[in-house]
Amino acid sequence: MEALTLLYMTCGDRGEAKAIARTLVNERLVACANILGKMTSIYQWQGALEEQEEVAVLLKTRRDLTDAVTERIKSLHSYDLPCVISLPIQGGYPDFLSWLQGEVG
């Protein structure tokens, strides 16, 4: 079985998150996207403390597609510097992981 990864991405609103997620799934770059509820992000940006409502998105894919997914997100995202973080999937329900592998690429 090929290595799998969970990508974490944030978006400014649910509409943008859905649009990006649909594109990534339709293009078979990710098998599944989970859009989570609103959250508050607090961070430094260009010398100022920022606080913004965002939504988080979890994306499941093969590890070898991480760079392609990241580049596609950058081309679709409204942020100058979108948050895209990769976390390795170390295990899970084998049937689900097999399905995931079959849906991408």
PLM segments and residue spans:
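Positively charged, small/polar-rich N-terminal and surface patches that mediate targeting and assembly
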Residues: M1-G105
